[in-house]
Each structure stands twice: as structure tokens, then as C-alpha cells.
A protein has these predicted regions:
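Short, low-complexity N-terminal intrinsically disordered segments enriched in polar/charged residues
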Residues: 1-35
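Binding-site signature for planar aromatic cofactors or substrates
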Residues: 5-12, 51, 81, 86, ...
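A solvent-exposed, acidic/Ser-Thr-rich amphipathic alpha-helical stretch
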Residues: 26-91
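Short beta-strand edge/turn micro-motifs at domain boundaries
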Residues: 84, 105-135
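Beta-strand elements of well-folded, non-transmembrane domains
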Residues: 91-93, 128-129
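A short, acidic/glycine-rich surface segment
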Residues: 93-98, 133
């Protein structure tokens, strides 16, 4: 059996984040992060630990309608059991009525570690480039 390119596994990890959050599959979402992860989303908030970030995302997305987190331009660098990734994000978060929403553009800077369970995000910084609203609530 051959080992896969770690960049493919990390790309799958990043897609798993989007899939977990958009489907509100919180057990899947939790598999993206280390237990002691640190996430800094600037004005949106800062969270320490997978429980804290999962609870926040669950509560805020419970009020939302449909969401789509599209991740592109994944620049991944691997050094042994550590990696870094910069990923562009184009997120559409519909309000509960699905008639209006927010479009957030920015990028994630991730520090990723290989664990016994596979690659996990240990630290994430979200930098927003533009946030716009659309539609009539």
C-alpha cells in the first residue's frame, strides 16, 4: 500500500470543514480540529478548544438558512508532521428565511498537525476581505 500525498489529505481536511459546517454535521465538523485548537476570526470572535468553536458554530448556524462555504486556492506546505495552508473562502450565509443573506470573502491561514487520527487544524486565523449583504430580509 502506498502513502497518499499529505497535501491531498490536508485538502480533504479543509473540504471536510466546509461540508461539516454547511450540512450542520457537528460530529464531522469536530474531526477538523485538534482538541486544543485556537481560532481567531477577528471581529467575529476567538475560540479556544474544539468544544467552544463547535458550540459557537452550532448556535450561530441554527439561526441561518442555507450556507455555502466555497474553499479555493489552497496553498499547502508540509514539513514532516506539521503543515500550513492559506485557503481562500467565499461564504454565503443565508438568513433564516433564505431570501437574503451575507457574502463573506477572505482567507484562512491554518497551522495543521498530523495526529494519530490524521491531519487536524491546530490554529486558524480568518482574515475578511469583504462582507456584503444581499436580498430583502
Amino acid at each position: 500500500m502506498t502513502e497518499t500525498d499529505p497535501r491531498l489529505d490536508i485538502s480533504d481536511l479543509l473540504v471536510r470543514y466546509a461540508t461539516g459546517i454547511d450540512s450542520r454535521d457537528w460530529p464531522l465538523f469536530r474531526t477538523v480540529f485538534t482538541d486544543d485548537c485556537h481560532l481567531d476570526y477577528g471581529e467575529i470572535g476567538v475560540w479556544n478548544g474544539v468544544d467552544e468553536v463547535t458550540n459557537f458554530m452550532d448556535q450561530t448556524h441554527a439561526m441561518a438558512g442555507h450556507t455555502m462555504h466555497r474553499l479555493t486556492n489552497q496553498a499547502i506546505a508540509v514539513a514532516g508532521d506539521n503543515a500550513s495552508a492559506r485557503t481562500y473562502v467565499d461564504a454565503v450565509i443565508m438568513f433564516g428565511d433564505n431570501q437574503a443573506g451575507v457574502n463573506a470573502l477572505g482567507f484562512y491561514d491554518d497551522e495543521i498537525v498530523r495526529t494519530a487520527d490524521g491531519w487536524r487544524i491546530a490554529r486558524r486565523r480568518f482574515t475578511h476581505v469583504r462582507v456584503t449583504t444581499f436580498g430583502q430580509p
